[in-house]
């Protein structure tokens, strides 16, 4: 017997005691963030029918919890798009939010620390209707913020939101990450531009997937340079598409081996010393945490992003205006990442002032290359 109220782990053989598991994670200073997607999912032909999910979909239609078409029927994500055939919750409807988050309240109660709010770009048609009066044309950009804003209202102050999509006001729903990239050399420059663009919109905390999310496993060279870049952005993470995931046709990876962990890269490329090399950068990151923490607090108080293109702080400096591949992380660290394949050295612009090499401790006077 299933009811629309049965949304918990109680009957799952995979998670017999999630509350105890979360408590043990917290004892090790590990926080748990759960992935979310704003859909009433249409199951695939290869999935076992979930009666609980079907009940939830039927309930959403009956009570008008989902976005509608002009004729009043539920809008479904068009074929050829992610989660095709799924319906979308209408977060402008107070009853939708009450139902949606009522089914997730127990997650916060048991200690879940936040949510990774993926998706948010599912409005592909203009003639759609929302409870709050918004049309599909207006919602194509705004839905992402309606969605993440609803989650922000649901969370406690100590919880975190980790989002991909956004619109005007996205700075109020941190953290954000740059979405899914392929493991290709050209992507590293692009992802840096995405981070600096996000900073200029006021987003304070930003991240990306080290060396890409999908496609063939990155080379040690790409992974090394991506890790070095990630060490000096607000949030450092590696992440990868699961085997047989959504990009298996568009960006095929290595069969059964998509994991982007440092040790898997070392194993796949037969370079055992690579793990220790990456450990150096991860330890450096941990040693930077006091600086990053104080910088994050400062940015919240002063409404400034942590990661800033040089032009943000040196607006009258023509060289700073032209610098597309350097940035500040807080007030004291200037990062100039290696973005080209097999690159080991590069030139950079130092703004006015005295600068010190992080590793060499050598002093450099600014206002020159």
Regions found by a protein language model. Give the residues of each.
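Catalytic-domain carbohydrate-binding cleft regions of carbohydrate-active enzymes
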Residues: 1-369
């Amino acid at each position: 017997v299933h009811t629309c109220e049965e949304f918990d782990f109680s009957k799952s053989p995979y998670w017999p005691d999630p509350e105890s598991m979360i408590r043990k994670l917290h004892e090790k200073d590990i926080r748990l963030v759960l992935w979310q997607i704003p859909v009433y999912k249409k199951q695939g032909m290869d999935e076992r029918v979930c009666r609980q999910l079907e009940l939830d979909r039927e309930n959403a239609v009956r009570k008008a919890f989902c976005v509608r078409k002009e004729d009043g029927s539920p809008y479904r994500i068009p074929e050829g798009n992610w989660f095709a055939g799924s319906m979308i919750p209408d977060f402008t409807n107070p009853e939708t939010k009450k139902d949606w988050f009522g089914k997730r309240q127990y997650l916060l109660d048991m200690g879940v620390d936040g949510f990774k709010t993926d998706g948010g770009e599912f409005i592909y048609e203009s003639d759609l209707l929302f409870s709050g009066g918004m049309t599909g044309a207006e919602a194509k950009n705004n839905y992402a913020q309606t969605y993440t804003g609803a989650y922000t209202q649901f969370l406690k102050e100590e919880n975190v939101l980790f989002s991909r999509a956004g619109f005007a006001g996205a700075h109020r729903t941190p953290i954000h990450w740059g979405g899914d990239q392929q493991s290709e050399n050209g992507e590293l420059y692009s992802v840096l531009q995405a981070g600096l663009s996000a900073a200029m919109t006021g987003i304070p905390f930003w991240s990306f997937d080290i060396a890409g999310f999908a496609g063939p496993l990155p080379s040690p060279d790409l992974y090394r340079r991506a890790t070095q870049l990630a060490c000096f952005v607000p949030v450092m993470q590696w992440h990868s598409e699961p085997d047989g995931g959504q990009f298996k046709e568009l960006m095929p990876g290595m069969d059964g081996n998509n994991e982007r962990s440092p040790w898997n890269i070392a194993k796949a490329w037969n370079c055992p010393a690579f793990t220790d090399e990456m450990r150096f950068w991860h330890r450096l990151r941990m040693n930077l945490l006091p600086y990053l923490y104080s910088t994050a607090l400062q940015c919240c108080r002063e409404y400034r992003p942590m990661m800033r293109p040089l032009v943000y702080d040196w607006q009258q400096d023509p060289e700073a205006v032209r610098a597309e591949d350097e940035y500040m992380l807080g007030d004291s660290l200037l990062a100039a990442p290696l973005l080209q394949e097999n690159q080991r050295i590069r030139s950079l612009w130092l703004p006015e002032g005295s600068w010190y090499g992080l590793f060499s401790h050598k002093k450099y006077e600014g206002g020159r290359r």
